[in-house]
Amino acid sequence: MKICGPKLSLCGLIISVWGIIQLVLMGLFFYINSVALIEDLPIDEEFNSVEEFYTAATSAYNQNAYNCWIAACIYVLTLLLSAQQFYVNSRATAN
């Protein structure tokens, strides 16, 4: 079933591949607690102790990593849809 044209399906392929690469890497950097990404954590500004901060930061890092990996999986679905549409469009032009 044809949903989109050849240009849009190719654009979807390219953007999906880039999104998968970027989100997997961001998830990896969040998972290893990269200091460069600390500004992106949804944590409070003030804590009573250092241990409380470390616990909240580790939890937020892990949650952001999982969110990135879930978004990468959604991009895989978009990649599959775009690849199927590219295949359908290439068969239609070959005949």
Swiss-Prot record:
Please state how the activity of this protein is regulated.
Inhibited by Zn(2+) and Hg(2+), while it is unaffected by Ca(2+).
Q: Which InterPro entries match?
A: RNase_K (IPR026770)
Look at the named UniProt entry and state the broad enzyme category this protein falls under: hydrolase
Superkingdom, taxonomy of origin? Eukaryota
Reported EC number(s) for this entry are: 3.1.-.-
Q: Does the keyword Lyase apply?
A: no
Q: Where in the cell is it found?
A: Membrane
Annotated TM spans: 12-32, 68-88
> What coarse category fits the chief subcellular location reported for this protein?
membrane
Recall the GO molecular function terms of this protein's record. Answer: RNA endonuclease activity
Q: What keyword terms does UniProt attach to this protein? A: Endonuclease, Hydrolase, Membrane, Nuclease, Transmembrane, Transmembrane helix
Q: How does the protein's chain sit in the membrane according to the entry?
A: Multi-pass membrane protein
| A cellular component annotation (GO) from this entry | membrane
Function text: Endoribonuclease which displays activity against poly(C) and poly(U) synthetic substrates, as well as rRNA.
Task: Name the family.
Answer: Belongs to the RNase K family.
Return the protein name: Ribonuclease kappa-B
Which species does this protein come from? Ceratitis capitata
